Amino acid sequence: NRDNMQLYGYGRATTPRLLDMQRRHPEEMLVLRHAWSADASTLPSLNNLFGFGEPDAAQAQHLIAMARTAGYKVWWMSNHDDIAVEQQHARLANVVDMVNRTPGRASASLDGELLDCIQEALADPAERKFIIVHLLGAHPHYRLRFPKGENPFDDEVDSVETQMVTQQRSALVRRHRQEYDAALLYHDFVVAESLRVTQLDAKAQERRAWVYLSDHGQEAGPGENRAGHSPGTEAGYRIPTIVWTNHSRPAASTDVAQRPFRADWAGWTVADILGLDWQGEMPERNVLNPQYRWQPPNLPVQVKSFTD
């Protein structure tokens, strides 16, 4: 949930590395302030992302298949064990690295295990590379998503804790919030490091880009007295989205950063960054395109404002 990220104004220091990178290179790093998922769980969100928001259409396209047709070597690397995701998406890649084979919430595999895989892919001599990294992120159980003993928010009475007490959130939910925020702090390390290694050692005139977004959000106490997946509240759909590229300057326009964005349209933006060109292209769904035209997704919750 972007509301728990310091980069988006949260009161706890959950994203110090990303915030520092954005402050040092604001002209290269675009933070979309109003990003939404159209789904509150992983599989439908990924189906929409890679299927351009229409995965069940008669002439449905798949982003990975299109990239391979265009000459890209595609990697799928994941710390998220899910047989459906593997069968519907990962198997389309040229190279598949699955570092976690423990399904469900009990896995204690940390996302940092993927950093070596990213560096190996970046070092590959292929001329065109499309590297997809699927993290566990801050999925429950939150206490398993960061190294043991690395929770700086544990039992800290700060403004966030005080507000939750005022909201009469239970001790269990307050503990889950502490663990969720600690998971996001570790997530910040992994995500920022993936960006850092992408930025390193680029050859002259080599085009590189990096896109980060979540498949869905989480409820961790702001809307209801509970924590976890949340298809029934806004928190389940409020996500972060960041774009970095070394060959253009999308962040130069404040207008782009303030545009509402939906993850089921992300395929159009990634396809544009990859330089894919095909008859079914819809620039009005590409948030980086001047022709972009926002349409609210049909969510099962009432949203007061998509630009809040």
Identify the role of each PLM range.
Residues 1-162, 238, 263, 267-293:
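Active-site-proximal alpha/beta segments of enzymes that process anionic O-linked groups
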Residues 78, 214, 245:
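Short beta-strand/turn micro-motifs composed of small residues
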Residues 1, 212-217:
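DG-centered beta-turn motif at the end of beta-strands
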Residues 134, 139-140, 216, 226-229:
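Histidine-centered active-site/metal-ligand motif
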Residues 65, 196-206, 218-221, 229-232, ...:
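Membrane-interface soluble catalytic domains
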Residues 130-134, 211-213, 242:
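Structural motif
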Residues 116-119, 158-210, 261, 265-267:
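A long, amphipathic alpha-helix that forms part
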Residues 18, 22, 133, 148-150, ...:
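Proline/Glycine/Serine-rich low-complexity intrinsically disordered segments
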